[in-house]
Amino acid sequence: MIDEALLKLLVCPKSKAPLKQVGNELICEVSGLAYPIEDGIPILLVEEARELDKGSDKK
């Protein structure tokens, strides 16, 4: 789990929007990217992010 104070400082490198932690990923709803967290370290590289499925978490 990422420290709450650190999470408030982190932003998506593509959109500069805030991130939220879901499991072992940091999610950017603006850019539609999920950044992995490996061994407690967020990997905030666009080329390492996966694209979110459109509408997968919205009803």
Swiss-Prot record:
Can you tell which superkingdom this protein's organism belongs to?
Bacteria
Coiled-coil ranges (or none): none
Q: Which Gene3D superfamilies match?
A: 2.20.25.10
One GO CC annotation: cytosol
Signal sequence span is none
InterPro entries xrefs: Trm112-like (IPR005651)
Return the PANTHER family for the record. PROTEIN PREY, MITOCHONDRIAL, ZGC:162634
The similarity comment for this entry is: Belongs to the UPF0434 family.
HAMAP family, from UniProt? UPF0434
Q: What name does UniProt use for this protein? A: UPF0434 protein COSY_0767
